[in-house]
């Protein structure tokens, strides 16, 4: 893929590879990210996916040339274009494999959506974050479902409306990222997190992601309770569910680690 570097394995890595434009995305990047996460999500050998980037910035949002083209788009063309971006974010968010954003530099605008769509995020302490859209007469509509889930509505009210830049410590405080480290510790921290993802039951991890999507932020009512009851009953009866319990009782490794 022209705009990405992809390394496969138990822990696959998808690297944004446009450092000359601060890894800003355009329609080509969007299509390639969508394809990459779709393919890796279906690969039984892949147990976790790291989203990384080359150069000093993680992602600066939309590519300037792409923005120039968008300025001349009709409403219908803008709808189609926005739908592609929304589809990419949803593909990352619903990827059946756990995803980790490895943030080595600044994150702006649409790049915030990439971070928020991942299950986990590790940032260097030198990274800055900004939802800059209102300064351009726009607003962060497509990324909003993911960013609001990640940072919470209260923080979103502040940073969506003011377009203030904030640092990694603030990103950690509001829940956008899960860990902040020095640049020389970044790879070690990511490597520290991924073994737990690789060693867990593949089916349980996939089903757990679906559970999180179905339960988080929802009202506790009969329908939600029924979903959780059916979920635990189904996974208990699954092959990996049975194997996991038996291996624990027999004090041996489960077959997905054999």
Model-identified regions with their sequence ranges:
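Terminal peptide-recognition signature
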Residues: 14, 18, 32-33, 51, ...
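Crotonase-fold acyl-CoA enzyme core
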Residues: 90-203, 243, 252
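Conserved CoA-thioester-binding segment of acyl-CoA-metabolizing enzymes
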Residues: 1-54, 87-90, 187
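A short, glycine- and basic residue-enriched loop/turn
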Residues: 19-22, 56, 61-64, 106, ...
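A general structural signal for well-ordered alpha-helical segments in protein cores
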Residues: 30, 61-64, 85, 144, ...
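Glycine- (often His-adjacent) and acidic-residue-rich active-site loop
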Residues: 53-91, 107, 219
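C-terminal alpha-helix plus adjacent terminal tail
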Residues: 1-12, 44, 163-169, 184, ...
């Amino acid at each position: 893929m022209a705009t990405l570097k992809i390394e496969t394995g138990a822990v696959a890595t998808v690297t944004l590879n446009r450092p000359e434009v601060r890894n800003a995305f355009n329609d080509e990047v969007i299509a390639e990210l969508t394809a990459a996460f779709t393919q890796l999500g279906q690969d039984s050998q892949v147990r976790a996916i790291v989203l990384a980037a080359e150069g000093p910035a993680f992602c600066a949002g939309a590519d300037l040339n792409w923005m120039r083209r968008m300025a001349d788009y009709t409403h219908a063309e803008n709808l189609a274009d926005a739908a592609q971006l929304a589809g990419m974010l949803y593909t990352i968010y619903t990827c059946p494999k756990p995803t980790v954003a490895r943030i080595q530099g600044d994150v702006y605008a649409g790049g915030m959506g990439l971070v928020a769509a991942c299950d986990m995020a590790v940032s260097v302490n030198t990274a800055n974050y900004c939802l800059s859209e209102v300064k351009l007469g726009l607003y962060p509509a497509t990324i909003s479902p993911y960013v609001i889930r990640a940072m919470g509505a209260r923080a979103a009210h502040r940073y969506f409306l003011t377009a203030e830049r904030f640092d990694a410590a603030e990103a950690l405080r509001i829940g956008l990222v899960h860990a902040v480290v020095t640049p020389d510790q970044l790879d070690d921290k990511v490597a520290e997190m991924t073994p737990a993802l690789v060693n867990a039951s593949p089916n349980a991890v996939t089903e757990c992601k679906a559970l999180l999507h179905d339960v988080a932020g929802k009202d506790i009512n009969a329908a939600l309770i029924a979903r959780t009851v059916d979920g635990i009953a189904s996974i208990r009866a699954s092959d990996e569910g049975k194997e996991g319990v038996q291996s624990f009782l027999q004090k041996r490794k489960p077959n997905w680690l054999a």
